[in-house]
């Protein structure tokens, strides 16, 4: 239905802005073309929503977001606020702002989503702009970008679980941005809820006043009506001047087949209308605005966006190249470039986990490239580099902020674009310190220095570490410490922030963290632990490249840089697993795992054997020996010149999780 409405909007555009409605009456109606000229937009009567927004001064704008640990009820609370303001109908709505299929399937927020709301407080209309942010650490770049368009935040805590690792991380992010924080305790209707404990934790951990907290149940709607007056009273209005030249920040973008790239923008000064000519500070490219509007909660066209507002725009002619939309870029009107100081933009997040992606069918490479580029438009924290493999053909090396980020991106490629892909296991970057003093960070295991180069030219190898913050009940302390120590961890601090809850800090190698550490942590604590982490620099490490050899020929698609303590275990696992997926040949196939020049594991696949003694008389011993020797020599020759053909499906099965 939404797509139909957008198509109707597109088709109903008629006159150029320079033409008047009166001038069109000179021509007979039947001679008028039904196709819209470029840069055209019909002047529709202002809707009731638009009329109400036009009457609201910037002093009655409020831009705020909801931040919390994953699964503490942010999206459900967003639904209740949208219902309370009449933005959506009550009852049948579940996670309206979780618009991706993968979000609804997994029950998590992946993309920060925005929505404008109108709310009447004490007889005056207020324009509220809500951002529902992700809770998981892998999507922190989304959270930090959201803060740029907000003046305050609702800090949400689950009454039954209390403060958890990402609550702490999100608090410090918001605090560093100078946001006004409103404490909210959610899920107070649960039998296991302990609101007083959550309030005490907020006071002790964040020094937030328990008296200012609002206790709600987003599921039942209990006390949710108290939140919006609290937002109006405590969160400051945005600062901006609509009479100044346009200064507009690009916060996010996505791709539409019919409209090209659509931009989500925050206006700091000035205003923007259909037909305005704007220019990008980052690229210098100029565009004509085709439509402006707000998310209410879906795209709702408006005649103007003013300073203080957050809304969407797209251009006519459309912005077709996704690379032109640089998140954090500043736009202004053509001619005002020297009058406007560009905004600082956003800090580029660093990719911490890398995978290689290849199409199952090599002819699908162009489709895979288009699909990845469209998803990157909507997720700028992904890095992209082309690469090729002898075994799997042309593909890409993709960088992500974490393993969940990688998994969600893979799901979106399959679901939204129908991509059939082979994904290699995640790896982390490593640093090479050369003897001439140069440092090089390498993300592709295939580029790891060879044994001779290591001895002659390399001073040391380093791997990245992270500072992990773990929160869990005190009864699991022994198991968690044991898990961290077995993953080469180094304890940094241990504190009790309640009599039963522990905050444990460990420095861990990032390589161990991406090797399903969170799954093992959940298993050790029966699901009660939470994890957050931040970069902690590089450390000298005894690492080497583990690779798979088939008849002494390296398989370039299967290689990984690992710590020496993992070489034996991984090597044995690789050869036994790969053996299952390689077909028998007319000669013996030897599968080896090697770290440098040392073979650490080996498996053999026996050849098909022809019975050369079938027609031989039983008593002819010398003839028997001669035939067997001849067969043996033939096998040696075949093994020396024969190539092992490994099918695509073998790699697919081997690399499957």
Swiss-Prot record:
Stated membrane topology is: Peripheral membrane protein
* Residue positions binding GTP: 109-116, 173-177, 227-230
**Protein family membership:** Belongs to the TRAFAC class translation factor GTPase superfamily. Classic translation factor GTPase family. LepA subfamily.
- Enzyme Commission code(s) on record: 3.6.5.-
Q: Where in the cell is it found?
A: Mitochondrion inner membrane
Q: List the disulfide bonds.
A: none
Q: What does this protein do?
A: Promotes mitochondrial protein synthesis. May act as a fidelity factor of the translation reaction, by catalyzing a one-codon backward translocation of tRNAs on improperly translocated ribosomes. Binds to mitochondrial ribosomes in a GTP-dependent manner.
Write down the chemical reaction(s) this protein catalyses.
GTP + H2O = GDP + phosphate + H(+)
Pfam families on file: EFG_C, GTP_EFTU, LepA_C
Which Gene3D superfamilies does the entry link to?
Answer: 3.30.70.240, Elongation factor 4, C-terminal domain, Elongation Factor G (Translational Gtpase), domain 3, P-loop containing nucleotide triphosphate hydrolases, Translation factors
What is the source species?
A: Ajellomyces capsulatus (strain NAm1 / WU24)
Q: Name one GO molecular function term.
A: mitochondrial ribosome binding
Q: Which keywords label this protein? A: GTP-binding, Hydrolase, Membrane, Mitochondrion, Mitochondrion inner membrane, Nucleotide-binding, Protein biosynthesis, Transit peptide
HAMAP family to which the protein is assigned, alphabetical:
LepA
Record keyword Nucleotide-binding present = yes
Report what the protein is called: Translation factor GUF1, mitochondrial
């Amino acid at each position: 239905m939404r797509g139909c409405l957008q198509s109707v909007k597109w088709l109903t555009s008629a006159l150029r802005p320079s033409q008047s409605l009166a001038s069109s009456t000179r021509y007979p109606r039947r001679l008028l073309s039904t196709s819209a000229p470029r840069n055209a937009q019909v002047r529709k009567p202002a809707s009731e929503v638009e009329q109400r927004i036009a009457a609201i001064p910037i002093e009655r704008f409020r831009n705020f977001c909801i931040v919390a640990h994953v699964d503490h009820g942010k999206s459900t609370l967003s639904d209740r606020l949208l219902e309370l303001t009449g933005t959506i109908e009550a009852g049948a709505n579940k996670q309206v702002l979780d618009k991706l299929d993968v979000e609804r399937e997994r029950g998590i927020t992946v993309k920060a989503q925005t929505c404008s709301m109108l709310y009447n407080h004490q007889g005056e209309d207020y324009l509220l702009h809500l951002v529902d942010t992700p809770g998981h650490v892998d999507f922190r770049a989304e959270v930090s970008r959201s803060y740029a368009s907000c003046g305050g935040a609702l800090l949400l805590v689950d009454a039954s679980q209390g403060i958890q690792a990402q609550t702490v991380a999100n608090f410090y992010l918001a605090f560093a941005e100078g946001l006004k924080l409103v404490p909210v305790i959610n899920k107070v209707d649960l039998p296991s809820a302990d609101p007083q404990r959550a309030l005490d934790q907020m006071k002790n951990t964040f020094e937030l006043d328990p008296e200012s907290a609002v206790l709600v149940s987003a599921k039942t709607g209990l006390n949710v009506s108290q939140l919006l007056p609290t937002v109006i009273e405590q969160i400051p209005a945005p600062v901006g001047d609509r009479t100044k030249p346009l200064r507009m920040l690009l916060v996010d973008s996505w791709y539409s087949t019919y409209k090209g790239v659509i931009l989500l923008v925050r206006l700091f000064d000035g205003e923007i209308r259909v037909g305005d000519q704007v220019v990008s500070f980052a690229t210098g490219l100029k565009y004509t605005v085709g439509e402006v509007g707000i998310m209410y909660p879906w795209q709702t066209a408006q005649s103007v966006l003013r300073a203080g507002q957050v809304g969407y725009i797209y251009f006519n002619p459309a912005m077709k190249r996704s690379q032109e939309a640089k998140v954090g870029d500043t736009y202004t009107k053509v001619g005002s470039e020297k009058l406007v100081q560009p905004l600082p933009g956003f800090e580029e997040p660093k990719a911490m986990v890398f995978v290689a992606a290849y199409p199952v069918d090599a002819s699908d490479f162009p489709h895979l490239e288009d699909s990845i580029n469209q998803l990157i438009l909507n997720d700028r924290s992904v890095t992209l580099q082309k690469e090729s493999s002898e075994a799997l053909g042309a593909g890409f090396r993709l960088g992500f902020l974490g393993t969940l980020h990688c998994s969600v991106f893979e799901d979106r490629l399959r679901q939204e674009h129908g991509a059939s892909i082979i994904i290699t296991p995640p790896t982390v970057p490593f640093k090479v310190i050369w003897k001439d003093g140069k440092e090089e960070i390498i993300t592709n295991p295939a580029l790891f220095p060879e044994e001779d180069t290591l001895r002659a030219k390399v001073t040391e190898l380093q791997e990245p570490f992270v500072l992990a913050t773990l929160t869990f009940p005190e009864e699991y302390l022994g198991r968690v410490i044991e898990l961290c120590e077995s993953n080469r961890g180094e304890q940094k601090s241990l504190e009790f922030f309640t009599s039963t809850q522990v905050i444990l800090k460990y420095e861990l190698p990032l390589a161990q963290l991406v090797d399903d550490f969170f799954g093992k942590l959940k298993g050790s604590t029966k699901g009660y632990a939470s994890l957050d982490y931040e970069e902690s620099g590089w450390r000298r490490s005894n690492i080497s490249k583990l690779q798979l050899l088939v008849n002494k020929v390296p398989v370039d698609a299967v290689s990984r840089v690992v710590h020496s303590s993992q070489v034996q275990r991984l090597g044995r696992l690789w050869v036994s697993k790969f053996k299952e997926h390689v077909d028998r040949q007319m000669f013996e196939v030897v599968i080896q795992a090697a770290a440098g020049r040392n073979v650490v594991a080996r498996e053999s696949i026996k050849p098909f054997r022809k019975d050369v003694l079938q027609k031989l008389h039983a008593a002819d011993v010398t003839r028997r020996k001669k035939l067997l020797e001849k067969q043996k020599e033939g096998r040696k020759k075949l093994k020396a010149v024969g190539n092992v053909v490994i099918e695509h499906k073998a790699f697919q099965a081997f690399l499957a999780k």
